[in-house]
Every structure is written in structure tokens, then in C-alpha cells.
Amino acid sequence: MRRRITFVQRPETPFSLDQAVLTPDALALHGIDGAREERATFSVDELPEELSDVLKQCHQLHVRWASERRYDAVAPFSSRVSPGLHVFYTPVDGSSEENKLKSLCALLKRAFDYGLKCKSPETLEESFITPPILSTRFASTAAFQYHSLLPTLDNLVAYIENKICSSSDEQCLRYAASIRSADSVDINYDSISHSLTVLGYWSQSPKNGWTDEIRRHAAGTDQVEVGLLGTEAATEPEDIKMGGLLAVVGKDDQLSMLSSGLPSEFGVAYGYGTDDSWAEPTLFSFPSRHQPLPEDATYSISFTSPTGLHPTMTISMPPSSLNSPPAPPDATCALHTYLTLPSTIFGDKYQLSTTDPLFLDSHNLVALHAVAGETDLEAPDWFVSRWGSNWLLELATPSESDQVPEEWNVTIPLHLRYLRPSESGYRSASVPWPVVFWACTAEDGTKMGVNPFDRVNLGWEGLFGTRTMFYQLHPSSDRLVEELEVPVLQLDDKGFFQSKAIELGTMIVIGLGSLWVLWKLGAIAWSSGTRPQRKSTKQKKSE
């Protein structure tokens, strides 16, 4: 197992060298204030058999989990996904789809939640959706996609502790337990590297900062890299500038300054000093697809009340969110939102894909660019086998001639499916917040290569070209899931009687209507049959 631990401090955060003390066996940290990313990489041989068997059926498997709590996505960890569990999967060729999905669904349920809406049907399409690929050049986009709300990662922690960590590996057990407090977790596997990578991200340090002793592995075979980094304003708009200190625990005898260049696990070269004096760390820059925005670039989500069966999602943004991002001068930018909707709620793709300017202007929409998943307008929720749908919408912004209001509202009309009856006459439907971002075309000639912190397979970034830069708006609420109260058929004594009466009344009306139609058809047939007879009788009398 290889570990990479990165601390990123804000430019104004103080730091002194006595907060990081490197010894031959460990790095002792004290009161580090900043975001933390921890990455563990396992070879397939290190994994339990039940996990490696499933991975061997995957060409690529990417899991993204984001907390329902609001958190800061600081550079270079600026990208976001909607709250919950996201799975992006491409199977290998050569084995049946039923076996692939059966083993994958079973693994997802054991590792995350046995209540996941992931069955083992005959085809992948009955549980996973197929995302649209608008940018064919973005080859890393997975073939199938899945989502489910998942408030906690308690099951994943237990799975790692019991299946991956040995009982004597205290560092592995401690890392697994720390996942409970993570703001986001990524899991990646591809058949080329044959390695599984688990990344956890914590946007805030504990009350007294990060205090930890990061020790080298007892066997001395597993590498542990630690970076203490900071960000500064970059010269080029597509770049992120960073600098700081590095150490390989158990190998280096002092913290190393960063120098320019991007080799190694961190993407930087090592530069050792010849004495104990410390100069300012050398800064380095690299192009990044995901860029930060100021803290006041926020958005909020709400639904009109009462929601009924046709709720309207409102995305509200202050004027600071409508300012064009600091993209290259020749870049073209547009504001977008990417909705991840569970099966209980959906949009009307025919309505949202309209080009009617009156409809679009009334909702401050520009266009629906992509939709995938369940869009059946009539099916109740219990008839829908797949998890839900995704929607990519371009949002309108005030023109330069318009006076910018204190709050710019974008409205998206949605629809709720019929849910199963309940005793109260209502059921709850949970809707995760969408992500809202600016998408800007990068300058011609910009090499958007993979940087050490790059994050791909988020679902929405694969719908754009490879030279697109993204600027994420920050959600403003403490909880990023909306709870809707959905009216359903009531199942208490009175409601049950009423439901039976309604069913009986409906059957009577249908029966009477059918008899009336048959009676009318019979009358028409009888009258059309008697007319020729009357004509022939009259003709005989005249003769």
C-alpha cells in the first residue's frame, strides 16, 4: 500500500517549521490548519478475493461520495458532485452482463448499504443508466452510471476494517475510521494500472488543527509521502500556483522544498538543502480544469410550497455569482447546472428541450443540453427499475443592459411520480442539490494535462470538451438535500374505505361508459341496417 497525505493551507494561514518534525521513522505534525486529502493505493494482490474478483470484471470503476453537509472545496480540490453515492462503471468484454452486474451490485450493497436500488437483472440497463457522451474525445467517461443518497459511510468503514485492513495494522484501521468524518471519498480502479485507489477529503481541520504522527510502514516496503502545501494567485488564468514542503517518511532525513517540474507521486521534484537554513519554498504552476471562485459566489436551492405533484426547483444566486469567472480573455463562458434526480422526481424532457423563447425566458433557462435515465411521464415509482435521471441545463444570466437584481432566480419545473400509499397520506421524497458551475473554453494551445490533483469521472465534466475549465459555485445551506412532502393515497381506516369506494366508483363509471358506447354503436348498426330494407320496400310499392 502506498499513501499520499496532502495538507493545503490558505495563503493567510500561519505556519512554522516546528509544526512538522521529521524523524527517521515518522513525521510529527502539530496544529496544522488547512484542508487534508489522504490517498491510499492498493495493488490487486493486496485486496481480498471477493473484491479482486469483481474488479477483474471492470474495465474501469469509479465511486464518488459527497457528504450531505456543506463543505469548502478549496483549490486544488475545487470540483463537486451532488450529495450521495455515485458509481461510474465500464465492464470488460467477454463475460455476461448478468454476472458482471450481479457481483458488482452485491459488492456495492456489502460495502455501502444493503438498501441500494441495485438489482441483479439480465442487463445493466435495468439498474444503471447510460450517460450521454457529448464529447467523444473525453475517453475516460464510463459506460454506465448509478446514484443513491447515502448519508453516512459507516458500512464502508466496517468493510475496510474487516476485509482490507489486518487487525495489527493500526494505521490502516485509523485511516478507515477517519473516513466517517470525510467530506468526500473517491474510489478508482482501472484495468490498465491494476490498482485500487481510495481518496478521502476533509475541508476543515479539527478545532486545534491536524495533530498526527505519520509513521513509516513497519515492514518498510510501503511508501508514505506527505506534503504541506499552500496556494497563491497564479500568473495565467488557467493555472494553479502552489508551493510548500515534502517528505517521504522513513526515507528522507529532512523536509524538502518544492522545485519546478512535475515528476513523482505529488507531481513535483525534490530539492534538498545543503544546510539547515530554510529559504522560501519555490512555487510551481500547472493547468487545472477545476478552478476556485470567491467565497461569495454562492447559490441556494428551494422548492415552492406546497409542492404538490408538480414542484418547481428554484436556484437562487446573488450578483457575485453572476460575474464572469477569471477565465482567459478569449474564453467563452456559460453558467450550467447538473441535476441528479432520484426516481421519485423527474423532468419533462419535451418541455425542457423546447426552443420557445417565452418559456425559456420565464424560467431564466437557455437550453437543455443532455438528459439520461428515467424520463417516463406516466410510470409510478414502483414501476421504475433504475435509480433516476441526470439533466444538464444551461442557465441564463442578466444581460449587460439589465439591472442585476439582488437575487437572480432560475426555475426548473419538475414532476413527482405516484408513490405508494401511506397511513398519513404523505410520503417524503429526498432531492439532492444539483451542482452549479461556469464552463469556459480554455485558450487555444493550452495543454490541460492530468495534474496530481486532477479529478475526472464526475458525471458532468465528460459532457464538455477536454479544454473546458470549470468554476464551481459554492452551496450556501448547511444541508444539501431537500425533503419534499408528497401527497399519496391514505391507508388508515377512513382512507382505506375511501380508496375502495373510489376504486368501486371508478369501475362503475367505466362499466356504464362502456355500456353506453356499445349501446350507441348498436343503435348505429341497427339504424344503418334498417334503412336499406325501408328503401327496398318503398321501391316495391312504387312498382
UniProtKB/Swiss-Prot annotation:
Query: What residue intervals traverse the membrane?
Result: 504-524
Positions the record marks as coiled coil are none
Q: Where in the cell is it found?
A: Endoplasmic reticulum membrane
For the Cytoplasmic compartment, the record's topological domain ranges are: 525-543
Gene Ontology molecular function, alphabetical = mannosyltransferase activity
The keyword Glycoprotein is annotated on this UniProt entry: yes
Q: Name one GO cellular component term.
A: endoplasmic reticulum membrane
Whether Membrane counts among this entry's keywords is yes
Q: Lumenal compartment: which residues?
A: 1-503
PANTHER family, from UniProt? PROTEIN PBN1
Full protein name: Protein pbn1
Q: Which organism is it from?
A: Aspergillus oryzae (strain ATCC 42149 / RIB 40)
Q: Which gene encodes it?
A: pbn1
